[in-house]
């Protein structure tokens, strides 16, 4: 069969991007999530301890696993409001995801440690929040199993910064 430039085709130019078509299929999901915590009041402020966990399993009714399913996660956090400082320390353990669909690769788990400390200053009728933060303090190479581009674009490495927020 001959092809001519002036003939119309089913194909369209997508600007070099991959065209993907997704179809829905029946699936069965099971899982759970929970969170427990407690707070303590002190003369200088308050402290809250929290633990949460979530896990999901799913398979297509035709047999294989549902793709890009989030792995189990455990999160521990400490929130405090002490002597005018609001502090949050959180640690999250994301498990390996080895229960994968036929078309995907397993993803390694990772540990994520984040910290933020905020102080609010009154400026007349306005307020200024100054936050010092650290994200991924362990500098882990972390990939989200749910991402289509997990291999090309891991989560950011260690990130330290200062954030200012001014309220009129």
Language model region names:
Residues 4-99, 138-141, 165:
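Gram-negative outer-membrane beta-barrel transporters
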Residues 29, 69-75, 110-114, 149, ...:
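Transmembrane beta-barrel architecture of outer membranes
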Residues 33-38, 114-120:
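Short, well-ordered amphipathic alpha-helices
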Residues 81, 108-111, 123-126:
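A structural signal for short secondary-structure junctions
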Residues 100-101, 148:
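Short structured motifs
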Residues 101-107:
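Short, surface-exposed loop/helix-turn segments at secondary-structure junctions
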Residues 119-168:
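C-terminal beta-signal and adjacent terminal beta-strands/loops
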């Amino acid at each position: 069969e001959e092809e001519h430039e002036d003939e119309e085709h089913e194909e369209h130019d997508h600007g070099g991007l991959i065209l993907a078509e997704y179809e829905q299929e029946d699936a069965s999901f099971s899982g759970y999530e929970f969170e427990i915590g407690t707070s303590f009041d002190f003369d200088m402020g308050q402290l809250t301890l929290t633990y949460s966990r979530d896990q999901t399993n799913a398979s297509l009714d035709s047999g294989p696993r549902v793709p890009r399913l989030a792995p189990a996660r455990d999160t521990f956090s400490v929130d405090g409001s002490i002597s005018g400082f609001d502090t949050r320390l959180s640690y999250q353990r994301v498990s390996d995801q080895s229960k994968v669909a036929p078309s995907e690769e397993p993803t390694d788990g990772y540990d994520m440690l984040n910290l933020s400390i905020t102080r609010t200053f009154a400026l007349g009728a306005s307020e200024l929040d100054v936050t010092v933060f650290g994200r991924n303090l362990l500098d882990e190479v972390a990939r989200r199993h749910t991402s289509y581009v997990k291999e090309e674009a891991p989560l950011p490495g260690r990130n330290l910064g200062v954030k200012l927020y001014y309220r009129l």
